[in-house]
Structure formats: structure tokens, C-alpha cells
């Protein structure tokens, strides 16, 4: 069995349980496991994690007043994905629109979640390898 390398992220949130509920409603995330202050989630097979940053020398974007990472999600239907986040209270960063790229048209837009994290949502075209 080949194990694929996965790069994931852990998002700082003030309350992991509350944040988990939001991501499940907004993004259709499912919970992998729950340790209380640290929770594993996945969206369409892509894992990510939530943690309360208590005494860990890191902080949430809301506390810092800025974000240093943008979360990029590549899905089959970015319009529906972004609409679900907006319906759950996400703040639009950029509506889904077509971007002309060297490989063709790429549909992408974005939102800020309630915890200050910037999410860009696009189709899977950047993941395709040229023939």
C-alpha cells in the first residue's frame, strides 16, 4: 500500500468545538477525531485541523489583526462550495469568477471565515498535469 504525502494545516481558533460546528455547516466538513481543544476535520477527503492556541506561541488571525496564510481549496464546484460558506456567515473576499491562466480558464473566489482565515476556492484546473 502506497501512502501519499499530505500537507495539511492547523487553524488557530478560540473555541475548537464551536469552530468545528461552523466548518461542518459551512463546508460540509466531517469530524475525524476530537481531543477537545484540538479537532481533526476533513472536506472531501482533504484533512485539516483546528486548535485553541493557548500557550503555544501562535495566535488566530482575529487576535493578530492579519492573516499570514491563505487556505486554497480545489473542488469540482467552487460556486456551490463558496455559496455554502457564505450562507453560514462567511465574509466574501472575492466572488467566484473566471481567471485566464496559461493552462486555460480557472474559476476561483474566496472568503474569510469567522476566525479570520482567508480561504480561496477554485476548480481543480491548477492540479492537472499537462498531457
Task: Give each language-model segment a name.
Residues 11-15:
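Short, surface-exposed ligand-recognition loops at beta-strand->loop->(often short) alpha-helix junctions
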Residues 115:
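Conserved ATPase active-site switch/coordination loops adjacent to the nucleotide-binding site
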Amino acid at each position: 500500500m502506497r501512502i501519499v504525502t499530505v500537507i495539511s494545516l492547523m487553524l488557530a481558533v478560540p473555541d475548537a468545538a464551536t469552530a468545528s460546528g461552523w466548518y461542518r455547516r459551512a463546508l460540509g466538513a466531517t469530524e475525524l477525531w476530537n481531543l477537545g481543544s484540538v479537532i481533526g476535520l476533513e472536506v472531501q477527503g482533504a484533512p485539516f485541523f483546528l486548535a485553541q492556541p493557548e500557550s503555544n506561541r501562535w495566535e488566530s488571525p482575529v487576535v493578530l489583526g492579519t492573516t499570514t496564510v491563505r487556505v486554497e481549496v480545489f473542488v469540482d464546484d467552487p460556486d456551490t462550495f463558496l455559496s455554502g460558506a457564505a450562507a453560514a456567515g462567511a465574509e466574501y473576499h472575492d466572488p467566484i469568477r473566471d481567471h485566464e491562466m496559461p493552462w486555460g480558464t480557472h474559476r476561483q473566489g474566496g472568503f474569510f471565515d469567522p476566525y479570520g482565515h482567508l480561504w480561496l476556492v477554485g476548480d481543480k484546473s491548477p492540479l492537472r498535469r499537462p498531457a
